[in-house]
Regions:
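DEDD superfamily 3′-5′ metal-dependent exonuclease/proofreading module
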Residues: 1-194
Length: 194
Protein backbone atom coordinates (compact mmCIF):
# COMPACT_ATOMS: atom_id res chain seq x y z
CA UNK A 1 0.00 0.00 0.00
CA UNK A 2 2.81 2.46 0.85
CA UNK A 3 4.53 1.65 -2.41
CA UNK A 4 1.31 2.44 -4.31
CA UNK A 5 1.02 5.79 -2.47
CA UNK A 6 4.63 6.62 -3.29
CA UNK A 7 4.11 5.75 -6.98
CA UNK A 8 0.94 7.87 -7.10
CA UNK A 9 2.75 10.82 -5.47
CA UNK A 10 5.68 10.55 -7.90
CA UNK A 11 3.29 10.17 -10.84
CA UNK A 12 1.52 13.42 -9.87
CA UNK A 13 4.90 15.16 -9.55
CA UNK A 14 5.90 14.02 -13.04
CA UNK A 15 2.57 15.20 -14.47
CA UNK A 16 3.11 18.61 -12.86
CA UNK A 17 6.64 18.83 -14.24
CA UNK A 18 5.41 18.10 -17.78
CA UNK A 19 3.27 21.24 -17.58
CA UNK A 20 6.41 23.25 -16.74
CA UNK A 21 8.35 22.18 -19.85
CA UNK A 22 7.08 25.09 -22.03
CA UNK A 23 8.86 27.49 -19.64
CA UNK A 24 12.16 26.21 -21.04
CA UNK A 25 11.32 27.90 -24.36
CA UNK A 26 12.18 31.30 -22.82
CA UNK A 27 15.87 30.37 -22.59
CA UNK A 28 15.93 29.75 -26.35
CA UNK A 29 14.59 33.20 -27.26
CA UNK A 30 17.91 35.00 -28.00
CA UNK A 31 18.76 32.50 -30.75
CA UNK A 32 15.25 32.32 -32.18
CA UNK A 33 14.60 35.86 -33.47
CA UNK A 34 14.03 37.07 -37.01
CA UNK A 35 13.39 40.74 -37.81
CA UNK A 36 10.46 41.21 -40.20
CA UNK A 37 9.66 44.93 -39.99
CA UNK A 38 11.41 48.17 -39.10
CA UNK A 39 9.66 51.49 -38.54
CA UNK A 40 11.56 54.74 -37.99
CA UNK A 41 9.23 56.94 -35.90
CA UNK A 42 11.62 59.87 -35.47
CA UNK A 43 12.23 59.63 -31.73
CA UNK A 44 12.28 55.84 -31.61
CA UNK A 45 12.97 52.83 -33.76
CA UNK A 46 10.24 50.17 -33.71
CA UNK A 47 11.28 46.66 -34.67
CA UNK A 48 8.91 43.75 -35.16
CA UNK A 49 9.76 40.16 -35.75
CA UNK A 50 9.04 36.49 -35.35
CA UNK A 51 10.28 33.91 -32.91
CA UNK A 52 11.06 30.33 -33.93
CA UNK A 53 9.69 29.20 -30.58
CA UNK A 54 6.17 29.37 -29.18
CA UNK A 55 6.01 31.16 -25.82
CA UNK A 56 3.49 29.94 -23.24
CA UNK A 57 2.78 33.45 -21.91
CA UNK A 58 3.63 37.04 -22.92
CA UNK A 59 6.57 38.77 -21.33
CA UNK A 60 7.62 42.44 -21.16
CA UNK A 61 11.24 43.51 -20.80
CA UNK A 62 12.86 46.90 -20.19
CA UNK A 63 16.54 47.80 -20.06
CA UNK A 64 18.19 51.23 -20.37
CA UNK A 65 15.16 52.74 -22.09
CA UNK A 66 14.74 49.86 -24.54
CA UNK A 67 11.37 48.14 -24.28
CA UNK A 68 10.41 44.72 -25.64
CA UNK A 69 7.20 42.68 -25.72
CA UNK A 70 7.42 38.97 -26.53
CA UNK A 71 4.12 37.26 -27.21
CA UNK A 72 3.47 33.77 -28.61
CA UNK A 73 5.61 33.75 -31.79
CA UNK A 74 6.24 37.49 -32.19
CA UNK A 75 8.21 40.31 -30.62
CA UNK A 76 8.11 44.11 -30.70
CA UNK A 77 11.07 46.21 -29.61
CA UNK A 78 11.28 49.97 -29.14
CA UNK A 79 14.69 51.67 -29.11
CA UNK A 80 14.83 55.36 -28.11
CA UNK A 81 16.78 57.60 -30.49
CA UNK A 82 18.95 60.47 -29.25
CA UNK A 83 19.27 63.54 -31.49
CA UNK A 84 22.76 64.85 -32.24
CA UNK A 85 25.17 66.33 -32.41
CA UNK A 86 27.16 63.72 -30.50
CA UNK A 87 30.92 63.39 -30.32
CA UNK A 88 33.38 60.79 -31.55
CA UNK A 89 36.56 61.04 -29.43
CA UNK A 90 39.86 60.43 -31.20
CA UNK A 91 42.39 58.32 -29.32
CA UNK A 92 45.60 59.91 -30.63
CA UNK A 93 44.88 63.45 -29.36
CA UNK A 94 48.58 64.43 -29.39
CA UNK A 95 48.46 64.56 -33.19
CA UNK A 96 45.82 67.32 -33.15
CA UNK A 97 45.33 70.95 -32.23
CA UNK A 98 42.02 72.27 -30.94
CA UNK A 99 40.40 75.38 -32.42
CA UNK A 100 38.23 76.70 -29.53
CA UNK A 101 36.35 79.30 -31.61
CA UNK A 102 35.24 76.62 -34.07
CA UNK A 103 35.01 73.86 -31.46
CA UNK A 104 36.86 71.38 -33.65
CA UNK A 105 40.23 69.70 -34.04
CA UNK A 106 42.63 69.70 -36.96
CA UNK A 107 45.74 67.60 -37.52
CA UNK A 108 48.94 69.35 -36.42
CA UNK A 109 50.21 69.14 -40.01
CA UNK A 110 47.36 71.49 -41.05
CA UNK A 111 47.29 73.48 -37.81
CA UNK A 112 50.74 74.91 -38.54
CA UNK A 113 48.96 77.24 -41.00
CA UNK A 114 46.55 78.49 -38.30
CA UNK A 115 47.28 81.61 -36.24
CA UNK A 116 48.78 80.38 -32.91
CA UNK A 117 46.34 82.56 -30.93
CA UNK A 118 43.42 80.56 -32.39
CA UNK A 119 44.64 77.07 -31.42
CA UNK A 120 45.70 75.03 -28.40
CA UNK A 121 47.06 71.50 -28.17
CA UNK A 122 44.19 69.03 -28.11
CA UNK A 123 43.44 67.14 -24.91
CA UNK A 124 41.49 63.89 -24.54
CA UNK A 125 38.43 66.03 -23.69
CA UNK A 126 38.73 68.36 -26.70
CA UNK A 127 39.86 65.89 -29.38
CA UNK A 128 36.53 64.97 -30.94
CA UNK A 129 34.57 65.09 -34.15
CA UNK A 130 30.95 66.24 -33.92
CA UNK A 131 28.29 64.48 -35.92
CA UNK A 132 24.67 65.41 -36.44
CA UNK A 133 22.00 62.79 -36.85
CA UNK A 134 20.07 60.41 -34.66
CA UNK A 135 21.78 57.85 -32.47
CA UNK A 136 20.72 54.77 -30.56
CA UNK A 137 22.24 53.50 -27.31
CA UNK A 138 24.63 50.57 -27.29
CA UNK A 139 24.39 47.98 -24.58
CA UNK A 140 27.58 47.33 -22.65
CA UNK A 141 28.41 43.95 -24.20
CA UNK A 142 27.36 44.77 -27.74
CA UNK A 143 30.20 44.12 -30.18
CA UNK A 144 30.47 46.32 -33.25
CA UNK A 145 32.90 46.25 -36.12
CA UNK A 146 36.22 47.85 -35.21
CA UNK A 147 35.62 50.50 -37.86
CA UNK A 148 32.35 51.62 -36.27
CA UNK A 149 32.32 55.09 -34.81
CA UNK A 150 31.06 55.06 -31.23
CA UNK A 151 29.73 58.42 -30.10
CA UNK A 152 29.17 59.97 -26.67
CA UNK A 153 27.45 63.08 -25.36
CA UNK A 154 30.61 64.16 -23.51
CA UNK A 155 34.04 62.79 -22.69
CA UNK A 156 32.89 61.77 -19.20
CA UNK A 157 29.80 59.98 -20.51
CA UNK A 158 30.38 56.22 -20.47
CA UNK A 159 27.24 55.53 -22.50
CA UNK A 160 28.06 54.94 -26.15
CA UNK A 161 25.84 55.50 -29.16
CA UNK A 162 25.87 54.43 -32.76
CA UNK A 163 24.69 56.58 -35.64
CA UNK A 164 21.40 55.39 -37.09
CA UNK A 165 22.36 54.78 -40.71
CA UNK A 166 21.78 52.08 -43.33
CA UNK A 167 24.22 49.68 -41.64
CA UNK A 168 22.43 50.04 -38.31
CA UNK A 169 19.12 49.36 -40.06
CA UNK A 170 20.31 46.11 -41.65
CA UNK A 171 18.52 42.96 -40.57
CA UNK A 172 21.70 41.16 -39.49
CA UNK A 173 22.85 44.12 -37.38
CA UNK A 174 19.44 44.51 -35.72
CA UNK A 175 19.20 40.80 -34.94
CA UNK A 176 22.63 40.93 -33.28
CA UNK A 177 21.56 44.02 -31.29
CA UNK A 178 18.29 42.38 -30.16
CA UNK A 179 20.11 39.18 -29.23
CA UNK A 180 22.48 41.17 -26.99
CA UNK A 181 19.47 42.85 -25.37
CA UNK A 182 17.73 39.51 -24.77
CA UNK A 183 20.84 37.87 -23.32
CA UNK A 184 20.54 40.26 -20.35
CA UNK A 185 17.33 38.43 -19.42
CA UNK A 186 17.96 34.94 -20.80
CA UNK A 187 21.67 34.19 -20.34
CA UNK A 188 23.00 31.21 -22.25
CA UNK A 189 24.82 28.42 -20.50
CA UNK A 190 28.45 28.12 -21.58
CA UNK A 191 28.91 25.40 -24.18
CA UNK A 192 30.79 22.29 -23.17
CA UNK A 193 34.27 22.37 -24.81
CA UNK A 194 34.51 18.55 -24.96
Amino acid sequence: RRLDLLKLHNFEDVLGMVRLIPILSYRKIPDQIRVTDLEDCGSELLIRGRLSVLLPAPIRLRLEGIYCILERETFRLSIPLTPGPLRYYLKDYRKYDYLPQEERVVPKTLAKYVDPSRKTPATPQTCFLSRDGRFFPLLGEFQTEESAYLFRKSYEDRRQYLLLDDTAKSTSFLEQYIRTFLLHFFPQEPSDPS
